[in-house]
């Protein structure tokens, strides 16, 4: 079964982008490479259950088990020892990537309070888009009664685009809600 967002990409986005940019080769048309979700857990040194809860929440959100990131060296001022867990990360590709992005665009982002759209300055100059979320409750899979603490996460959407403008056009065509540019300056 083809994911809904992937079928939109194949049937609507590719012809639209090809018409606008007049690509000479089909491999030049922008596409998604991967989505990386990262969640830092600095307080894991004081509370051992924090790692367990973070892995559970990220597994529910992403649909696959995250990888535990460990400290490479000890830093005494942070009470950090070598090989102590400092974060969890999951990389989504293929259908899981399209399913997650579809849920992010259509379910999670509209549930943010006072959401005005995603910041247009969050592109990195190489055709990738980064966004940070302050809490995991915006995803409908997370049960409010089962969380121990509000935890944020970083999401990196990696594309084959070569510049920020091309990536903006591509993600807008996929349905990402970006902030509108107002004509008056404050």
From Swiss-Prot:
Q: Does the keyword Glycoprotein apply?
A: no
The family database entries (InterPro entries) matched by this protein are listed as: Ribosomal_uL5 (IPR002132), Ribosomal_uL5_bac-type (IPR020930), Ribosomal_uL5_C (IPR031309), Ribosomal_uL5_dom_sf (IPR022803), Ribosomal_uL5_N (IPR031310)
Claim: Plastid is one of the keywords in the record: yes
The superkingdom listed in its UniProt entry is Eukaryota
As for subcellular location, the record says: Plastid, Chloroplast
Cite a single GO BP annotation.
translation
Keywords, alphabetical: Chloroplast, Plastid, Ribonucleoprotein, Ribosomal protein, RNA-binding, rRNA-binding
Entry GO terms, CC: chloroplast; ribonucleoprotein complex; ribosome
Q: Which GO terms describe its molecular function?
A: rRNA binding; structural constituent of ribosome
- A Pfam match is Ribosomal_L5_C
Q: Give the family this protein belongs to, as stated in its UniProt record.
A: Belongs to the universal ribosomal protein uL5 family.
Q: Describe its assembly.
A: Part of the 50S ribosomal subunit; contacts the 5S rRNA.
**Alphabetical list of PANTHER family matching this protein:** 60S RIBOSOMAL PROTEIN L11-RELATED
Function noted in UniProt: Binds 5S rRNA, forms part of the central protuberance of the 50S subunit.
NCBIfam families cross-referenced by the UniProt entry: PRK00010.1
What is the recorded name of this protein? Large ribosomal subunit protein uL5c
Q: Which gene encodes it?
A: rpl5
